[in-house]
Each structure stands twice: as structure tokens, then as C-alpha cells.
């Protein structure tokens, strides 16, 4: 007995399944498979904006870390609001914000002597003011984002932030920064 199957029906079914896959797979992949570069949840009350922060955004590179395709955001920043405070007393958090979305990424300190040499007149320990953060673009909605850095004191909890002149742009295919 021969089964008669319409070729157009089979092609329609295959195309429908492919479309469903490409629509629903990226969020499922991001939620269940990515372990690095995930935005964190923090309480973000009204913070004082300050200009008492020296900073530079050095780059946004694509990297593969633990088998995951990520972006590494890196640069340096330190507060000059209270020169008696140690820089290590502050936790730094990367904020990327658009009109409709806001994401927070913890910044990891990286040792470096070049900032210490450049700002030797401040008499501060600046050896760990370099930072980097892993960012998985699959968690970020397409759009144009402003970049901010939050400084949160580890002991007394006071916080302030510096808005940078850097824009982060998330397109459907990539993440870029414009300075």
C-alpha cells in the first residue's frame, strides 16, 4: 500500500518548525545553558550622581570563556570623592540603561600598575582599579544603552554612580561600544 503525502505540506511543516526553533531557542538557550555574563539583580534606589570618579572604558572584546561566547567589557575606574577611603572598600557595578531596560553586571578587579603610575600624586593605592565584566548579549534586548558605574561601599553601604560618555549598542547580532 502506497501512502500519498503532499510535498507542499511536508515543506510547510519543516519551514514552520524551523521558524518556531529560531524564535524560541535563543531565550531557552540563554536561560538554561549560559552560566557566565548573566545580569545580576540589585536594589537600585535613587543614587547620587557624582563627577568625583576617574574612569576609562578601554574596550569590549568577544571571548570564549568556559565554552560560552561572551563579551568582556574592561577599563578602569576609581572614586576621588573621599581620598581617605581605600578603593578596595568599594564594590563596583556596571550599569547599562536604556529608556526601557536596565541591566547590572558585577565588575571584577584586575591588578595593574599603570594607573598607579599615572596618578602617583594622589597617594592612593590604585593597583586594583582596573575592572572587567563578562556580558552575554543574549540577555540584553536590542537598543542603545548608556553606561554607568556604581560605587557601593562594602562596609557602610553608601552608593553613588558616575554616568560615562560611552554608549553600548546591542544589535540583533552583536554588542558594540561608541565613545
Give residue ranges: language-model regions:
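N-terminal secretory signal peptides that target proteins for export/translocation
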Residues: 1-5
Amino acid at each position: 500500500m502506497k501512502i500519498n503525502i503532499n510535498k507542499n505540506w511536508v515543506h510547510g511543516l519543516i519551514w514552520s518548525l524551523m521558524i518556531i526553533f529560531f524564535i524560541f531557542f535563543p531565550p531557552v538557550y540563554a536561560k538554561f545553558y549560559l552560566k557566565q555574563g548573566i545580569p545580576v539583580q540589585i536594589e537600585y534606589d535613587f543614587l547620587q550622581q557624582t563627577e568625583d570618579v576617574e574612569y576609562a572604558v578601554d574596550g569590549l572584546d568577544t571571548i570564549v570563556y568556559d565554552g560560552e561566547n561572551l563579551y568582556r567589557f574592561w577599563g578602569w575606574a576609581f572614586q576621588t570623592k573621599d581620598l581617605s577611603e581605600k578603593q578596595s572598600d568599594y564594590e563596583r557595578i556596571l550599569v547599562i540603561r536604556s529608556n526601557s531596560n536596565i541591566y547590572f553586571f558585577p565588575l571584577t578587579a584586575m591588578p595593574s600598575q599603570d594607573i598607579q603610575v599615572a596618578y602617583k600624586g594622589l597617594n592612593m593605592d590604585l593597583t586594583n582599579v582596573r575592572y572587567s565584566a563578562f556580558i552575554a548579549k543574549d540577555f540584553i534586548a536590542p537598543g542603545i544603552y548608556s553606561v554607568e558605574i556604581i560605587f557601593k561601599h562594602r562596609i557602610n553601604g553608601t552608593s553613588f554612580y558616575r554616568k560615562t560618555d560611552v554608549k553600548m549598542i546591542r544589535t540583533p547580532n552583536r554588542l558594540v561600544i561608541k565613545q
